[in-house]
């Protein structure tokens, strides 16, 4: 059997009656992987196979925590922008905010200050192996109403949004 017949992630989630044999070295009984309504199950019952847990970098966590301190809920455009700037999917950002709100409410019920439980950016939030990284953006400048020149926001990505007549302009050099 080829590898694609073993991996449930390579099969179509839209085919609700799809079934594939798992490894042939199971001697006691043949197990089948069944996909029903988008849920992957062994022998048609039991626990779902879950995607692996997302591991966030210290920079991503710092930016997510900083944004959560500003607002606990993101509008769709804000979520899309934050996800793109951090190299995450919108779903990952959405789930992170849901989990953070849940943790925040749980800490409030326990009577502790939820802001104290979060490590301060740039201190314990970074592991010993993580280099000190600059913030993704300077929120303090934008919060004070300081106007920024056009195309200065995230210069590394500004060329994605340029119109066709701007293609002749000099793009920032990546280091």
Curated annotation (Swiss-Prot):
Positions of the DNA-binding region: 49-108
Segments of skewed composition (Low complexity): 119-130
SUPFAM superfamilies: Homeodomain-like (SSF46689)
Subcellular localization(s) per the UniProt record: Nucleus
A GO biological-process term: roof of mouth development
Pfam family, one: Homeodomain
GO CC field: nucleus
GO MF term set: DNA-binding transcription factor activity, RNA polymerase II-specific; sequence-specific double-stranded DNA binding
Keyword terms: Developmental protein, DNA-binding, Homeobox, Nucleus
Chloroplast recorded as keyword: no
Polar residues biased stretches: 1-20
UniProt-annotated stretches for the region Disordered: 1-31, 109-131
Signal peptide interval: none
Major place of residence: nucleus
PROSITE patterns listed in its UniProt record: HOMEOBOX_1, HOMEOBOX_2
CDD domains: homeodomain
Family the entry assigns: Belongs to the distal-less homeobox family.
Protein name, UniProt field: Homeobox protein DLX-6
Species in which this protein is naturally found: Mus musculus
Name of the coding gene: Dlx6
């Amino acid at each position: 059997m080829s590898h694609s017949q073993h991996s449930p992630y390579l099969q179509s989630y839209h085919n609700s009656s799809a079934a594939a044999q798992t490894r042939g070295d199971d001697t006691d009984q043949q197990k089948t992987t069944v996909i029903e309504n988008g849920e992957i199950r062994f022998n048609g019952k039991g626990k779902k196979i879950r995607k692996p847990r997302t591991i966030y970098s210290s920079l991503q966590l710092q930016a997510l925590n900083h944004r959560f301190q500003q607002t606990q809920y993101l509008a769709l455009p804000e979520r899309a922008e934050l996800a793109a700037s951090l190299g995450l999917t919108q779903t990952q950002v959405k789930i992170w905010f849901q989990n953070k709100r849940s943790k925040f409410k749980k800490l409030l019920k326990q009577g502790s200050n939820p802001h104290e439980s979060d490590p301060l950016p740039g201190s314990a939030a970074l592991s010993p192996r993580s280099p000190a990284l600059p913030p993704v953006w300077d929120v303090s400048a934008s919060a004070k109403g300081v106007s920024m020149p056009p195309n200065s926001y995230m210069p590394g990505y500004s060329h994605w949004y340029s119109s066709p007549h701007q293609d002749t302009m000099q793009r920032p050099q990546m280091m």
